[in-house]
């Protein structure tokens, strides 16, 4: 039965696979080996970042503050990306009459329903299991007053935040509906990563393997509080997205000029800023000792450069609505 569940998941029948796994576990509750396989199966489709994101107290406070400020009695809230259900419960706690939250992963949706019931919000929070583009207005129960999401990745765009917001604003939201976060920005700065070259290949057993370095990804995730990273310029916004717009945001390119503070630069570091509303900002700017559930992304240069204080250096980028490419312009 568990083997069949795996085959069904591989075939994209996620809800049926989950139900079959649950049935197998229920039929043999004393089977320790089956229980172990069941735990592996249930967790196999759940990204580990779910266990990190809810521990970000600054992120939690930013969302909670914005929700409390926005929600008025009687409002309906739509959330895209349930996860643990924490933001949906925050919305209900802030006074929303109804919260509908979309979760495309059946195992996560099931866990979220259990969490929401356990915390006493089952009468006001409803989990829709499916991608938000499968939701209908009838299932939502009418247009919503507030849209809240956290489907942003380290580069902001990787979880299809743009198409999800555009469809929601067109099909599900009332005119003038508030969106939390209202805007998302891609921020960049010149930087030095003191460990950038650690994994580069050189001579191994007398053989020069350095040409293989051309195949190494130039993008590396770095925790924002890691001491290996030093900013070598003031930050700037490479892209700024209005999440409340129903207009399609086309693929685009952008450039800005960074004023170097001086010193060795071997890459460009990118992070995100979320303007929850006009008063509340969440930003995971790299700095010693800071923490964030999102990492910065270090874009290594082909070769390091030495900069002088005040030197102007061009940084450019492009996005295709889903992914992001960043580079230093020719000097």
What positions do the PLM features span?
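Class I SAM-binding transferase module
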Residues: 2, 9-11, 22-26, 31, ...
């Amino acid at each position: 039965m568990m083997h069949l569940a795996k085959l069904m998941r591989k075939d994209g029948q996620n809800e049926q696979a989950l139900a079959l796994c649950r049935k197998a576990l229920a039929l043999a509750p004393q089977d320790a080996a089956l229980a172990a396989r069941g735990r592996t199966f249930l967790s196999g489709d759940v990204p580990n970042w779910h266990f990190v994101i809810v521990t970000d107290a600054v992120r939690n406070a930013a969302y909670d503050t914005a929700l409390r400020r926005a929600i008025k009695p009687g409002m309906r809230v739509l959330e895209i990306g349930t996860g643990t259900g924490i933001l949906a419960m925050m919305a209900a706690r802030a006074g929303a009459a109804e919260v509908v939250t979309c979760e495309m992963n059946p195992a996560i949706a099931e866990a979220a329903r259990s969490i929401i019931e356990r915390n006493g919000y089952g009468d006001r929070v409803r989990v829709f299991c499916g991608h938000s583009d499968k939701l209908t207005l009838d299932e939502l129960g009418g247009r919503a007053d507030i849209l809240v999401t956290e489907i942003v990745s380290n580069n902001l765009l990787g979880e299809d935040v743009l198409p999800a917001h555009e469809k929601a604003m067109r099909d599900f939201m009332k005119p003038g509906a508030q969106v939390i976060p209202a805007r998302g920005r891609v921020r960049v700065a010149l930087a030095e990563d003191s460990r950038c070259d650690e994994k580069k290949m050189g001579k191994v057993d007398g053989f020069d393997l350095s040409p293989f370095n051309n195949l190494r990804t130039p993008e590396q995730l770095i925790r924002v509080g890691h001491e290996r990273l030093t900013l070598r310029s003031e930050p700037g916004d490479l892209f700024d997205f209005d999440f409340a717009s129903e207009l399609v945001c086309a693929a685009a390119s952008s450039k800005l000029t960074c004023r170097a503070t001086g010193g060795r630069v071997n890459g460009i570091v990118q992070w995100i800023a979320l303007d929850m509303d006009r008063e509340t900002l969440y930003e995971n700017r790299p700095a010693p000792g800071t923490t964030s559930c999102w990492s910065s992304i270090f874009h290594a240069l082909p070769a390091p450069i030495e900069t002088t204080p005040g030197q102007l250096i061009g940084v450019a980028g492009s996005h295709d609505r889903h992914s992001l490419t960043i580079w230093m312009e020719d000097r």
